[in-house]
Amino acid sequence: MELRVGNRYRLGRKIGSGSFGDIYLGTDITTGEEVAIKLECVKTKHPQLHIESKIYKMMQGGVGIPTIKWCGAEGDYNVMVMELLGPSLEDLFNFCSRKFSLKTVLLLADQMISRIEYIHSKNFIHRDVKPDNFLMGLGKKGNLVYIIDFGLAKKYRDARTHQHIPYRENKNLTGTARYASINTHLGIEQSRRDDLESLGYVLMYFNLGSLPWQGLKAATKRQKYERISEKKMSTPIEVLCKGYPSEFATYLNFCRSLRFDDKPDYSYLRQLFRNLFHRQGFSYDYVFDWNMLKFGGAREDPERDRRDREERIRQGRIPLPRVMLPTSSGRPRGTQEVAPAPPLTPDSHTGMERERKVSMRLHRGAPVNVSSSDLTGRQDCSRISTSQAHSRVPSGLQSAVPR
């Protein structure tokens, strides 16, 4: 039996989950296009999918915003069908052994600042800026950074008058503690400055491999947040950014200097990193670290990789991996800090053998429904049969969808 949503999208296997929704691979039966289908039980205590889909719709048309194809209800489930995307930056960070080159960090920073600026221009703040919420596109959009997960987004000003929300204190921490701004830790209402400060921590995370306040232990969630806050506030920006170009410290100092309702100078921040990019002699060829690892670990010879990549493009081969779907976390308010991702230690292969196998998979174009754990070499998933896919679909949806 064939399961459909919106009488157009065939439901496939489950490929991700969040705190208030599961994500399935789907297929548009009219065009054959693969899509991501997010389901949320209508009986959930705090429904979020309808709100999130409305925000996505307000963002439609922006560069790096996933296309929403259909929203509605099927049986016991709220449904959102959206464009299928590639791996998250967190997945790619793990694939690259938890270290990005300066060139890759700067290429990402330029696009990430623009995504945040666009969201702000639409009168919203994201409030959960982290590597998991930035995904790469697929195919021709493989070099494009997308921003996802508006489950915690909030309107910060009136759309017509641009009246800013009032300054408030004693707010609970919203977002992910690892990347939260200092003002967020202090209980101050979030605004545009906080999204950008969080991005600064993400960039240093990419540079360093981890942040000084990761891995702290505490008896309770509140105590852990306090320990993270104390470590963050006691670590001077210059110490955090030591050994890296001064632009990273300049960026964070600028963000922390903004007042609550200030409009950030996004162009200034982008130009900071663009000037550094040019001084380093880098080329805007959009060859990221994972592209070089993908084709046999040619990290030492970027010029050869560029020539190989151009040859693949001339031959009509897709230059980027199709490795997974968007893993929108859908994390509810008060998201907990998560532990650092484990090191890449395969169960039965050496690191070199694992990298070779992953590179070979990417070289031949891994299917889009491969899980993120497969990307890091932990397991080898293949497409499941139709009967298996159906067995994973909630029964409330099975009874509601036309056979």
UniProtKB/Swiss-Prot annotation:
It comes from the Eukaryota. Its EC number is 2.7.11.1. Residues 9-277 form the Protein kinase domain. The keyword Transferase applies. Keywords: ATP-binding, Cytoplasm, Kinase, Nucleotide-binding, Nucleus, Serine/threonine-protein kinase, Transferase, Wnt signaling pathway. Monomer. Interacts with per1 and per2. Component of the circadian core oscillator. Casein kinases are operationally defined by their preferential utilization of acidic proteins such as caseins as substrates. Central component of the circadian clock. May act as a negative regulator of circadian rhythmicity by phosphorylating per1 and per2, which may lead to their degradation. Participates in wnt signaling. Belongs to the protein kinase superfamily. This is Casein kinase I isoform delta-A. It comes from Danio rerio (Zebrafish). The lineage of its organism: Eukaryota, Metazoa, Chordata, Craniata, Vertebrata.
